[in-house]
């Protein structure tokens, strides 16, 4: 069931990025969509690319729902998990890039790339999608495909 859901999410994300937009929205929805995209973009840039876990409360609700089973639900669970992850040493050339952000009202999807050189000397790349639901200017929910 989970693999089926992940396959559906990946398919939906691929279509959204191939088209370049999720949906046509009314002008009021465009403003909401742009604000929500900015929240997610700023969160991703500040907290995940910038590795600044202490900034997470500016972006995540206390009751943040995390659908990735490797990260506990709630702001505290997110912060505890990412403090541990960010304490781990990364390859010197590790890079995380935000490639695209699309949204429709309260739903925002990002497309990102991670690159690094492994201990084997080989260059590695990982591409991923993350989907967020924004509520009242704060990230309320997160899904990802791996």
Whereabouts are the PLM-identified features?
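Bacterial N-terminal signal peptides
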Residues: 11-21
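Hydrophobic/aromatic beta-strand elements that line small-molecule binding cavities or substrate pockets
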Residues: 82, 96-101, 113-114, 127-132
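Short, cysteine-centered beta-strand-loop-beta hairpins and adjacent loop/turn segments enriched
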Residues: 88-91, 116-124
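A short, structured loop/turn motif at beta-sheet edges
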Residues: 101-108, 133-139
